[in-house]
């Protein structure tokens, strides 16, 4: 899988297919969006909102949630606002989000089955 991706990337760069995607690091619409990492949203969300490359800062995680006051999501939003000119933040959820139905004990069992030590999970 990795070699296939790297080969595609080499050809992409050699053909200069990146040129139509070039933009600045500053979002044209001065907008940041926090949303879920669900693969169904990859192209659907920007299309549904009429967004183009370079217009927004898109921050994604499982469930599109802020879990910690100084975690990665807040850090990303702070950088967007304080350094990149973002003036508005949208938090966008979606229907049938898998994170909503996840149970911590089931996740814990999956981690144990993969060899994660129980004492690590109790920290």
Model-derived regions: residue spans:
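Divalent-metal-activated hydrolytic enzyme cores
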Residues: 1-29, 64-73, 82-86, 97-123
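N-terminal low-complexity or amphipathic/hydrophobic leaders
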Residues: 25-40
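Short beta-strand segments
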Residues: 34-36, 60, 92-94
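Gly/Ser/Thr-rich loops at beta-strand to alpha-helix junctions
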Residues: 37-40, 95-99
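Short glycine-/acidic-enriched loop or helix-start segments at secondary-structure transitions
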Residues: 42-45, 100-102
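Short Gly/aromatic-enriched secondary-structure transition segments
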Residues: 46-52
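Glycine/charged-rich beta-loop-alpha catalytic/anionic-binding loops adjacent to active sites
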Residues: 53-64
């Amino acid at each position: 899988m990795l070699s296939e991706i790297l080969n595609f990337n080499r050809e992409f760069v050699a053909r200069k297919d990146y040129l139509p995607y070039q933009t600045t690091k500053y979002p044209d619409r001065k907008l940041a969006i926090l949303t879920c990492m669900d693969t169904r949203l990859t192209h659907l969300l920007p299309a549904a909102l009429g967004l183009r490359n370079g217009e927004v800062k898109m921050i994604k995680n499982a469930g599109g949630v802020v879990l910690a006051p100084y975690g990665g999501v807040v850090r990303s939003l702070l950088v967007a606002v304080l350094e990149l000119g973002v003036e508005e933040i949208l938090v966008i959820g979606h229907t049938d989000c898998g994170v909503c139905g996840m149970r911590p004990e089931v996740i814990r069992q999956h981690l144990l089955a993969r060899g994660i030590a129980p004492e690590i999970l109790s920290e």
